């Protein structure tokens, strides 16, 4: 059975982290996109563990710090959610755990 692809919006919050724990335990899903705001160390950890293809960081300072990592050169790292729809269209499941986003 093919793994389903998942996008987690709000990956560093409590619901996002719970979602990622389930993903890690089930082995039925592949996280391909994470969206987070300011939790620098959590974002770094999630990138290392889940190896998403796309990381969107809302906070400009955190985005700039993570963008400098040479290890993450193959990642698509964005600071703008304006065109997020084009990435979400390619994902099987989207978990929206961001307050104010439906």
Predicted regions and their residues:
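Beta-loop-alpha module in the N-terminal Rossmann-like domain of NAD(P)-dependent dehydrogenases
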Residues: 79-102
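Short acidic/histidine-rich motifs immediately flanking catalytic phosphotransfer sites
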Residues: 51-54, 73-75, 88-93
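Short helix-capping segments at alpha-helix termini
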Residues: 26-28, 70-73
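N-terminal Rossmann-like dinucleotide-binding module
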Residues: 2-53
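Conserved residues at the C-terminal ends of beta-strands
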Residues: 35-37, 58, 97
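Short acidic-hydrophobic, aromatic-tinged amphipathic segments that line or gate anion-handling sites
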Residues: 56-58, 74-83
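Short, charged/polar "capping" segments at the starts of alpha-helices
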Residues: 40-43, 60-66
